[in-house]
Amino acid sequence: VHLTAEEKSAVTALWGKVNVDEVGGEALGRLLVVYPWTQRFFDSFGDLSTPDAVMNNPKVKAHGKKVLGAFSDGLTHLDNLKGTFAQLSELHCDKLHVDPENFRLLGNVLVCVLAHHFGKEFTPQVQAAYQKVVAGVATALAHKYH
């Protein structure tokens, strides 16, 4: 991902304030509610029958935390996202058969959740930087598919 020094600074400064547990669960939960077809990859998670069930599901929260942990790792390797996410790309492609479009959807949901949590602090400039990052991560995760 090609970010200016200002964009990198904005991304890392905001990320230092992110509660990964809370934001991860909320982002994955919102993905599953807003794009219900993504639920098919989470059959083992139990009750996903209503928005409340999804948002309060402990397995959704735990996996969201795990996803955001991987995203955090990516933020420390912005110059090598393909390498950073190579194993996850292989897992999601070869074993889980996840539609790579879902990575883009989750990135966009994450941006919405960050905007909700940070309000005025999530300026248009910060959003633009995060959009670049989530697009880069989605591309890296989809790399094995190409």
From Swiss-Prot:
SUPFAM superfamilies reported in the protein's UniProt record: Globin-like (SSF46458)
GO molecular function: haptoglobin binding; heme binding; hemoglobin alpha binding; metal ion binding; organic acid binding; oxygen binding; oxygen carrier activity; peroxidase activity
Signal peptide from the UniProt entry: none
Domain Globin: 2-146
Reported tissue expression: Red blood cells.
One GO CC term on file: hemoglobin complex
Outcome reported for the amino acid change (mutating residue 13 to T): In 50% of the molecules
This protein's UniProt keywords: Acetylation, Heme, Iron, Metal-binding, Oxygen transport, Phosphoprotein, S-nitrosylation, Transport
Keyword Heme: yes
In-chain residues carrying the UniProt-annotated modification N6-acetyllysine: 59, 82, 144
Positions where Phosphothreonine occurs in the chain: 12
Gene3D superfamilies (UniProt xref): Globins (1.10.490.10)
Residues the record lists as Phosphoserine modifications: 44
Chain residues that bind heme b: 63, 92
Domain of life the protein comes from: Eukaryota
Modified residues (S-nitrosocysteine): 93
PANTHER family according to UniProt: HEMOGLOBIN FAMILY MEMBER, HEMOGLOBIN SUBUNIT BETA
Entry's family note: Belongs to the globin family.
Quaternary data: Heterotetramer of two alpha chains and two beta chains.
Function: Involved in oxygen transport from the lung to the various peripheral tissues.
Protein name listed in UniProt: Hemoglobin subunit beta
Protein species of origin: Cebus albifrons (White-fronted capuchin)
Gene assigned in the entry: HBB
